[in-house]
């Protein structure tokens, strides 16, 4: 059996870790042990925050909608109830965007939701 020297593969592995740790502070960018731990932790944070981002944006859309329907004497929950009763199936992201960029269209939706609540 021939001897296998690991220099090339080890260097390639280290290079991959250092590339991922570029921009990190202190030893975390240039010692392999610290860089490997930092890159792994960064991956954990990235995984966690990809999940968290969905919650954060949904909460933002809800806050925007609540603020947008208040001038029409509605709360967010009553507005959503009115939408479901009137059969309008537009998601919160689109509704939030309409409230900001297309106030006239949003107002028409609010009027329909209000009518469904009154009926």
UniProtKB/Swiss-Prot annotation:
* NCBIfam families with a match to the protein in the record: rplT_bact
Q: Which domain of life is it from?
A: Bacteria
Gene3D superfamilies listed in its UniProt record: 6.10.160.10, Ribosomal protein L20
Does this entry carry the keyword Translocase?
no
Q: Does the keyword Acetylation apply?
A: no
Q: What name has this protein been given in UniProt?
A: Large ribosomal subunit protein bL20
Its family remark reads: Belongs to the bacterial ribosomal protein bL20 family.
Gene Ontology BP annotations = ribosomal large subunit assembly; translation
A GO cellular-component term linked to this record: ribosome
Functionally, this protein is described as follows:
Binds directly to 23S ribosomal RNA and is necessary for the in vitro assembly process of the 50S ribosomal subunit. It is not involved in the protein synthesizing functions of that subunit.
Naturally occurring in which organism (per UniProt): Bradyrhizobium sp. (strain ORS 278)
**Recorded GO terms, molecular function?**
rRNA binding; structural constituent of ribosome
- UniProt keyword terms in alphabetical order: Ribonucleoprotein, Ribosomal protein, RNA-binding, rRNA-binding
């Amino acid at each position: 059996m021939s001897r296998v020297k690991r220099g090339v593969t080890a260097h390639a592995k280290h290079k991959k870790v250092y590339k991922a740790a570029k921009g990190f502070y202190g030893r975390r960018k240039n010692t392999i042990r610290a860089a490997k731990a930092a890159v792994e932790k960064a991956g954990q944070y990235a995984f966690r925050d990809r999940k968290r981002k969905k919650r954060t944006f949904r909460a933002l859309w809800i806050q925007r909608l609540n603020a947008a329907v208040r001038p029409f004497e509605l709360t967010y929950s009553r507005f959503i109830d009115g939408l479901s009763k009137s059969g309008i199936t537009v998601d919160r992201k689109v509704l939030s965007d309409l409230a900001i960029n297309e106030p006239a269209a949003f107002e028409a939706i609010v009027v329909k939701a209000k009518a469904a609540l009154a009926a």
